[in-house]
């Protein structure tokens, strides 16, 4: 679209790409995640309903999706505002807010946070995973889904005039459901019409990212403008990682700060540490992919906020960047990952 070409679209309007600054490409500022509640282990039912307290923090960190209140990030606007002010003070410029239809997107709240903190906030269009799809969504044709997504970018979403600046995170499960496949096809069609950035939440299986890209390609999507999220919990084998990287998407490591013994959504996954994530970044850089790497924290629960003893939105800037530099990643490469790559991805074609 000529009106958006060469621009970035935030909840406060269009800006020039050079205004973005350091960017976290996968975060949530207000959402609810009740759709993904995991029943607590026998004997832990009381903990799952108890207030968030320091004495329960370790249990909460290991079982974040079994605590009802923890899934309600939308209750913490004031805490998130404080976090964003700290993020800006630490050198942050932009947050890509990945909350889509199905997990309580709140565009007026995002606009308010952007106004009050000075942080650029970019909202996401589209739909999350199948379990959050309404009957109305399931009945929509690919053409209708495309029209909805395009309208959320061009005119505003959820009955507001606040416009989304990316499509996503578009949610997929494993195996990908028919409803999710339609949304992926609609995403590709909308991207073709708009020239806009897309970001994907793959199912929790190492085959999922490749399958998503295949569906998008067959539907005419622009893979060079597409981000594959959550690679830190999806692809571990270096050979498989390079095979996927050759497909041309952005490669996002977005769970920095999340270090758990057992990953509740897939016990077969050994969640990497932040040090291991940094080593993965270094490997990809050495293999020639420094122009395709993005990083973030994917904060989507209360316990990840500093208010509750979590790492917060400034963790990468304060802690991970020094670690990257100490492990031989150059300042120029860090700037590519935090500034240049997000800028290229977020700019409409």
UniProtKB/Swiss-Prot annotation:
It is an enzyme of class 3 (hydrolase). Its cofactor is a divalent metal cation. The keyword Hydrolase applies. It is found in: Cytoplasm, Cytosol. Its EC number is 3.1.-.-. Binds 2 divalent metal cations per subunit. Pfam families: PTE. It comes from the Eukaryota. A divalent metal cation 2 binds at residues 169, 201, 230. N-acetyltaurine hydrolase that catalyzes the hydrolysis of N-acetyltaurine into taurine and acetate. PTER also acts on other N-acetyl amino acids (Met, Ile, Leu, Val) and N-propionyltaurine, but at lower rates. This is N-acetyltaurine hydrolase. It comes from Danio rerio. The lineage of its organism: Eukaryota, Metazoa, Chordata, Craniata, Vertebrata.
């Amino acid at each position: 679209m000529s009106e958006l070409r060469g621009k970035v679209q935030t909840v406060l309007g269009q800006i020039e790409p050079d205004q973005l600054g350091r960017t976290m490409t996968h975060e949530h500022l207000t959402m609810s995640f009740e759709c993904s509640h995991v029943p607590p282990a026998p004997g832990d039912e009381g903990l799952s309903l108890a207030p968030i307290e320091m004495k329960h923090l370790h249990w909460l960190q290991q079982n974040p999706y079994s605590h009802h209140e923890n899934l309600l990030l939308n209750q913490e606007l004031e805490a998130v505002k404080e976090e964003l002010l700290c993020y800006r003070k630490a050198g942050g410029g932009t947050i890509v807010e990945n909350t889509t239809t199905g997990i309580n997107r709140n565009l007026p709240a995002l606009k308010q946070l952007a106004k009050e903190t000075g942080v650029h906030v970019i909202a996401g269009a589209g739909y999350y995973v199948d379990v959050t799809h309404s009957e109305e969504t399931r009945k929509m044709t690919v053409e209708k889904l495309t029209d909805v997504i395009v309208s959320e970018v061009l005119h505003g979403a959820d009955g507001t005039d606040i416009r989304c600046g990316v499509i996503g995170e578009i949610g997929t499960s494993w195996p990908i459901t028919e409803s999710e496949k339609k949304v992926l096809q609609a995403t590709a069609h909308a991207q073709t019409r708009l020239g806009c950035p897309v970001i994907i939440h793959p199912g929790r299986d190492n085959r999922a990212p490749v399958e998503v890209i295949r569906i998008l390609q067959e539907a005419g999507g622009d893979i060079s403008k597409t981000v594959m999220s959550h690679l830190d919990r999806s692809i571990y084998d270096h050979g498989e990682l390079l095979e996927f990287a050759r497909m041309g998407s952005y490669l996002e490591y977005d769970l920095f700060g999340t270090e758990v013994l057992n990953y509740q959504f897939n016990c077969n996954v050994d969640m990497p540490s932040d040090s291991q994530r940094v080593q993965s970044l270094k490997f990809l850089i050495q293999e020639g992919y420094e122009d395709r790497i993005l990083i973030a924290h994917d904060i989507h629960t209360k316990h990840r906020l500093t208010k509750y003893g979590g790492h917060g939105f400034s963790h990468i800037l304060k802690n991970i960047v020094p670690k990257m530099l100490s492990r031989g990643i150059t300042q120029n490469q860090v700037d590519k990952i935090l500034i240049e790559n997000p800028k290229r991805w977020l700019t409409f074609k």
